[in-house]
Amino acid sequence: MASSLDALKARVESLLGDHLESATIDRGELTIVCSASSIAVSCQLLRDQAGFDQCIDLCGMDYSTYRDGLHDRPRFAVVLHLMSVQNNQRLRVRFFAPDDDFPVVPSLIDVWASVNWYEREAFDMYGIVFEGHPDLRRILTDYGFVGHPFRKDFPVSGHVEMRYDPTEGRVIYQPVTIEPREITPRIIREENYGG
């Protein structure tokens, strides 16, 4: 297995050349990092010349809590999982949005049509804008939803809650009414164990 991964790594490195920032084999998978400016060209090369004809997943990542010196890249990344059926191989592709405040990356819908809803989900959950996407709108949250819930700075309790009001006969929005509570851990001493 390692020899086939090494061969795939060498092939991808020669195919992508300067478009490739890094390629690592970890836990039995090859992960490559490309720049956002060259991701469309890189993905077309991977599809047309390396046989990665299917994008089986696309997701967003928020690395804002990795600011401890170990992670010196931008905050938001997009991760693709590609599959080559003819070669029986998988590949993880990662690229970072250059701007942390307003993450914009190119859409890959022209390369793989299957990324349509994946890109909409990453936009809805993380606020990553896919430039060139024909229908980039929310897919999981409500139309009037404020913010992006998978961002690390989004409050756990949210901004508003919805509930059904029987007097009005409809669903209403109201500010979150969660009271903070103090949780005290319970200590069980050894002498109190049964037995």
UniProtKB/Swiss-Prot annotation:
Pfam families referenced in this protein's UniProt entry, alphabetically: Complex1_30kDa
InterPro entries, per the entry: NADH_DH_suC, NADH_quin_OxRdtase_su_C/D-like, NADH_UbQ_OxRdtase_30kDa_su, NADH_UbQ_OxRdtase_CS
Topology within the bilayer: Peripheral membrane protein
Localisation: Cell inner membrane
Source superkingdom: Bacteria
Single Gene Ontology MF annotation: NADH:ubiquinone reductase (non-electrogenic) activity
EC number, as in UniProt: 7.1.1.-
Reactions mediated catalytically: a quinone + NADH + 5 H(+)(in) = a quinol + NAD(+) + 4 H(+)(out)
Sorted UniProt keywords: Cell inner membrane, Cell membrane, Membrane, NAD, Quinone, Translocase, Transport, Ubiquinone
GO cellular component, one term: plasma membrane
Similarity-based family: Belongs to the complex I 30 kDa subunit family.
Role of this protein: NDH-1 shuttles electrons from NADH, via FMN and iron-sulfur (Fe-S) centers, to quinones in the respiratory chain. The immediate electron acceptor for the enzyme in this species is believed to be ubiquinone. Couples the redox reaction to proton translocation (for every two electrons transferred, four hydrogen ions are translocated across the cytoplasmic membrane), and thus conserves the redox energy in a proton gradient.
NCBIfam families hit by this protein: NuoC_fam, PRK06074.1-1
Subunit structure: NDH-1 is composed of 14 different subunits. Subunits NuoB, C, D, E, F, and G constitute the peripheral sector of the complex.
Protein's name in the database: NADH-quinone oxidoreductase subunit C
Naturally occurring in which organism (per UniProt): Laribacter hongkongensis (strain HLHK9)
Gene: nuoC
